[in-house]
Amino acid sequence: MSGAGKRVVVGMSGGVDSSVTAWLLKQQGYEVIGLFMKNWEDDDDSEYCSTRQDWLDVVSVADLIGVDVEAVNFAAEYKDRVFADFLREYSAGRTPNPDVLCNAEIKFKAFLDHAMSLGAETIATGHYARVRQNAAGRFELLKALDHTKDQSYFLHRLNQAQLSRTLFPLGEIPKTRVREIAAEIGLPNAKKKDSTGICFIGERPFRDFLNRYLPTKPGPMKTPEGKVVGEHIGLAFYTLGQRKGIGLGGSREGNGDAWYVARKDMANNTLYVVQGHDHPWLLTPVLTASDLSWVAGEPPAAGAAMAAKTRYRQSDAACTVQAVDGDALTLRFAEAQWAVTPGQSAVLYDGDICLGGGIIQ
C-alpha cells in the first residue's frame, strides 16, 4: 500500500512494535509523525515508572528512522475516563480491564482527535490486529494473522469512525518478523522486552498499588458449605479463579487440592473459596453482559452461533447468542467456561472477525 503524500500520526510508546510500525509506514511513503502519550502523572521518579526512559527510546528511534516526534499529556483524560472507572469497578467487587477502556477513550479518541488537529488523515498503532472494508462499505476489525499475538480483544469497543481512520501495519506480520526487522534496521530498542500488565501499575505489586486507593476491609473466607477457613483482606483485592495470594496454601483445611476464589458476597463481605480447578462453582454455562459495543453498530441476531472470549489469550469458545435485549446480551456456551469474571469483557467473533462485546455481569 502506498502512503505517498498522506500524513499519519503513529502512537509511539518506546517499544519495538510501535517503532517498527513507524518505520514500515515511512517505507510506504507516508509522512510520519510520532506521538508519545503520557497517560499517568504519579511516580515518575519511582523504581516502577519507565516513562522517562520510554520517551528517550522514542526520541532515539525517531532520530534513526527520520521522523518528527512530540509528547502529549493525556493524564487528566485518563484519570477521568479510565482510572475512575477502574476504581469504581474494583470497589464494587468486579475485575475491570482498563486496557479496553483506554483504547476506546484515549488511544482511539483523545489521541485520534489530537492527530486530526495535526492534519493527519489516519493514525496507526503497534497493535496486532487488522482492519478491512467489506463489500458493503463497513469497516471490520479482524484478528491479527499471528493469532498468538492477536489484540483484537482489547480493541472490540472501536467503532466505524475510529476504524476508518486507523492503520494496524503489524496485523499482517508475525511477531518474530517484527523483532527481525528491528534488528535489521538497527533500532536502539530492538531487544527491549514487551510491556506487560496494566500500564499505570507497571511492575509494582498489584495489591500494593490498589491499597493506595482502596481501603482493606477484612471478612470471612468460606467454603460453599459455609465453613470459615480463613480471613480475606477485602473483596476488592481478589478475582474469580485466583489461586495465588489467598493465604490458604499451608492450610490444614480441606482435601489437599489447591484453593481458588469462586464467588464474592458483597452484601455480607464474604469471600467464597473452593478446592479443585474444575469445581462446579468455577464453571459458567451462561453469562450476561451489558454496556454493549458493536463494531458495525448492530448486534448479532438472537440464535446466532458465534465464538467468544471471556478473557485475553483464551481460546475461542463456541457459543450461541440467546438474547440481545437493549443493553443486555445473553450467551450460552457449548461447554461451561472457567472462572467467568464480572467486570471483564465478553468479546464475540465470527471466524476472524471481531464483532464487539460487553462487560460481564
UniProtKB/Swiss-Prot annotation:
Residues 97-99 are annotated as: Interaction with target base in tRNA. It catalyses: S-sulfanyl-L-cysteinyl-[protein] + uridine(34) in tRNA + AH2 + ATP = 2-thiouridine(34) in tRNA + L-cysteinyl-[protein] + A + AMP + diphosphate + H(+). The record marks H127, Q344 as: Interaction with tRNA. Its EC number is 2.8.1.13. Disulfide bonds join C102-C199. Residues 149-151, 311-312 are annotated as: Interaction with tRNA. Keywords: ATP-binding, Cytoplasm, Disulfide bond, Nucleotide-binding, RNA-binding, Transferase, tRNA processing, tRNA-binding. Belongs to the MnmA/TRMU family. This is tRNA-specific 2-thiouridylase MnmA. It comes from Cupriavidus necator (strain ATCC 17699 / DSM 428 / KCTC 22496 / NCIMB 10442 / H16 / Stanier 337) (Ralstonia eutropha). The gene is mnmA.
